[in-house]
UniProtKB/Swiss-Prot annotation:
Top-level EC class: transferase
Residues annotated to bind uracil: I200, G205, D206, A207
Protein known as: Uracil phosphoribosyltransferase
The family this protein is said to belong to: Belongs to the UPRTase family.
Name of the coding gene: upp
């Protein structure tokens, strides 16, 4: 894991397996099925790092040989909240890692001015819960900012929120950091820039279209 000095709340997960799989996702000839599988696999690998600092306690268990005080995750419960629609493809990988997590949804679409328009919010109970927001792309950053806003407006502490994406543009990361400097953002790659259509370069195209086999 590495950081960029420009963005103190950004964490880039540069594990070789993540980078290898991301390269295949970038390939325009990768099939919808393979794209979907790779997204799930990368998210699972990223989830390992994202959950690294969950608090631990112990409980007494009986092995076939003896009783022992063994480590278990303590305290806060987890919720996975994909930003629709492309974020759905990431939730399965996180659920593979933490199958007991609750799942919420935040639905936004990008208007002509690239600003997010909210059309759905469904969340589990908020008390004493860590929320993992997920969306494959942080391009302009506005949708990511909006998703965090949704939780903060409901009094979820910043310390209980993380955002995870595959690729991000520096422009979007700056927008996110300006709005939420107290929320950690995890990505697999910080790409070069946004083009005139607000697409990440080099990026991987429209993640939702490639995930679901649709055309914009």
């Amino acid at each position: 894991m590495k950081q960029d000095s420009r963005f103190p709340n950004l964490f880039i997960l540069d594990h070789p397996l993540i980078q290898h799989k991301l390269t295949h996702m970038r390939d325009k000839d990768t099939s919808t099925r393979t794209f979907r599988e790779l997204l799930r696999e990368i998210t699972l690998l990223m989830g390992y790092e994202i959950t690294r600092n969950l608090p631990i306690t112990t409980r007494r268990v009986a092995t076939p040989l003896v009783e022992v005080d063994a480590p278990v995750i303590a305290g806060k419960k987890l919720a996975i909240v994909p930003v629709l629609r492309a974020g759905i493809g990431m939730s399965d990988g996180l659920l593979d890692l933490v199958p007991s997590a609750r799942v919420g949804h935040i639905g936004v679409y990008r208007a002509d001015d690239h600003r997010p328009v909210e059309y759905l919010v469904r969340l589990p109970d908020l008390e004493d819960r860590v929320f993992i927001l997920c969306d494959p792309m942080v391009a302009t950053g506005y949708s990511a900012v909006h998703a965090v806003d949704v939780l903060k407006r409901r009094n979820v502490p910043a310390a209980n929120i993380v955002f995870v994406a595959l690729v991000a543009a520096p422009e979007g990361v700056q927008v996110f950091q300006d709005a939420h400097p107290d929320v950690k953002l995890y990505v697999a790659s910080l790409d070069s820039h946004l083009n005139e259509h607000a697409y990440i370069v080099p990026g991987l195209g429209d993640a939702g279209d490639r995930l679901f086999g649709t055309k914009n």
